[in-house]
Regions:
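Glycine-rich "HGGG/HGxG" loop immediately N-terminal to the catalytic nucleophile
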Residues: 128-129, 151-164, 226
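Short glycine-enriched nucleophile-adjacent loop
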Residues: 198-210
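Conserved alpha/beta-hydrolase
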Residues: 139-156
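Short beta-strand element of the alpha/beta-hydrolase
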Residues: 113-122
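A catalytic-pocket lid/entrance helix-loop region that shapes and gates access to the active site
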Residues: 207-260
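Alpha/beta-hydrolase
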Residues: 238, 242-324
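Conserved acidic catalytic loop of the alpha/beta-hydrolase fold
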Residues: 168-188
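The serine-hydrolase catalytic nucleophile loop
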Residues: 126-135
Length: 324
């Protein structure tokens, strides 16, 4: 309702605002309803006759059960849309990876085609919907598998973000690769990574070159700290050039990376303005999809939608500083 109101009544076309608002409203609404239930139950017993209190309790419990059912149904009915083809595959499923439950999206028009494993950006990022949208053409010639890495959206609960290390990603990546090699009967698969995933992919290929036909990097990262220093300086120079004193003061106050704490918020302070700069200067043009539309996807239940943002924040904040 919130999204429809913004788009069709108020005529506001702002995917990022819609996502943040919709998730916030979901959390606030569910939290408020559950809090109201507790208050209602307590007051029912304190201020009402026994019969009225019993009826009120029954109504409250029923409402609570319906709310829980709504959340559960949203989780268990999440899916990836069907793919048409001679022998198609379109599955969204959990897999056991080194004793933990993580998620895979598998999509392709012919399951006999070579497997292409895609590693999302992050750490903590989820690109199930982005991959489905952007890699539709690849599904003709490959079985495109998107791995929800530990700490990201649907795989958020696989492990405490504070316990994730680079070795965790490498071990889990090797295990996912082995699952795919065994299931599809392929000695070697293709590997592709975006941003953080491009660095992870290089390291996975270095450890097990015998498992991969080729590696494809997009937004390739090779030096985490140098990347952040360059991004920080670019954002600071652009803020000075455009007279954005508030941003200049904020960036100068926090200083350049590396950071020992508050990494997610400090990194976002200069990365977020850079995205706007790229669009304003024409460096980014012709885009057909925004990553911020991702949480709308049918791949995510209500809890997943919350974890989409919380997982990125928590996991990035816990892991990224250790990659410097």
């Amino acid at each position: 309702y919130y999204v429809c109101l913004r788009r069709h009544v108020l005529r506001i076309q702002d995917p990022r605002g819609e996502v943040y608002g919709a998730v916030a409203l979901t959390v606030v609404t569910l939290g408020g309803l559950l809090s109201a239930l507790v208050i209602r139950v307590v007051t029912a017993f304190l201020h009402r006759p026994a019969a009225a209190a019993a009826i009120s309790l029954q109504i409250s419990l029923l409402t609570g059960a319906l709310l829980i059912l709504m959340v559960v149904l949203s989780q268990v009915t999440a899916f990836t849309p069907a793919v048409e083809g001679p022998d198609p595959i379109s599955e969204l499923r959990p897999v056991t990876v080194n004793g933990r439950t993580e998620w895979l999206s598998l999509r392709g028009r012919d399951r006999s085609k070579p497997v292409l494993l895609f590693l999302s950006g992050g750490p903590g990022g989820s690109q199930l919907v982005t991959a489905r949208h952007c890699f539709a053409d690849l599904e003709r010639d490959y079985v495109v598998v998107t791995w929800e890495q530990p700490g990201a959206a649907k795989s958020y609960s696989a492990i405490n973000p504070a316990d994730i290390t680079l070795e965790t990603y490498l071990a889990d990546g090797a295990a996912v690769t082995e699952i795919l090699r065994r299931e599809f009967g392929q000695d070697r698969i293709y590997l592709m990574g975006e941003s953080w995933g491009s660095a992870l992919g290089l390291m996975m290929a270095r450890e097990h070159p015998e498992h991969y036909r080729a590696f494809i990097g997009t937004g390739q990262m090779v030096d985490f700290l140098e990347t952040e220093r360059i991004d920080y300086q670019m954002a600071l120079e652009d803020a000075r050039r455009t007279g954005n004193k508030k941003l200049v003061d904020k960036l100068e106050e926090q200083g350049p990376p590396p950071y020992e704490s508050g990494i997610a918020l400090k990194t976002n302070a200069y990365l977020s303005p850079l995205y706007g700069t790229s669009a304003r200067t024409g460096q980014l043009r012709g885009a057909t999809f925004s990553t911020m539309e991702g949480p709308y996807g049918v791949e995510y239940g209500l809890l997943d939608k919350v974890a989409f943002f919380w997982g990125l924040y928590q996991t990035f904040d816990s892991v990224y500083g250790r990659l410097y």
